[in-house]
Curated annotation (Swiss-Prot):
Biological process terms in GO annotation: regulation of mating-type specific transcription, DNA-templated
Gene for this chain: MATA1
Other comment: Was initially thought to be alternatively spliced. This gene is functional with 1, 2 or no introns, but the functional protein is produced only when both introns are spliced from the mRNA.
Keywords, comma-separated and alphabetical: DNA-binding, Homeobox, Nucleus, Transcription, Transcription regulation
DNA-binding region: 70-126
Similarity-based family: Belongs to the MATA1 family.
Organism: Saccharomyces cerevisiae (Baker's yeast)
Protein name (record): Mating-type protein A1
Pfam families: Homeodomain (PF00046)
Domain of life: Eukaryota
Subcellular location: Nucleus
Amino acid sequence: MDDICSMAENINRTLFNILGTEIDEINLNTNNLYNFIMESNLTKVEQHTLHKNISNNRLEIYHHIKKEKSPKGKSSISPQARAFLEQVFRRKQSLNSKEKEEVAKKCGITPLQVRVWFINKRMRSK
């Protein structure tokens, strides 16, 4: 049983060492640990104990990563950019991707922000 505890401790260390990595990499490492456990000479009870330990730690990692990501703040568009967008909208209510990029450069915002602004403006205009 001491071997299982030390193995679980090593697994814990491994899982917490990969906190800075992407979720896909955490899943890959966790799956590798699961495969290693399944191929080992451990009893079913020991395997189950280790699986449970890994699952609990992976949940903690997910929650930790989720907490670290700050919510996206609402980006504001300057009054000058808004006025320019209004002018463009009066001329044309829908833009293709090249036009969105050009407008975005002139406004100092991203093409995605232009796209969302136009979608919202069309919805408000109905």
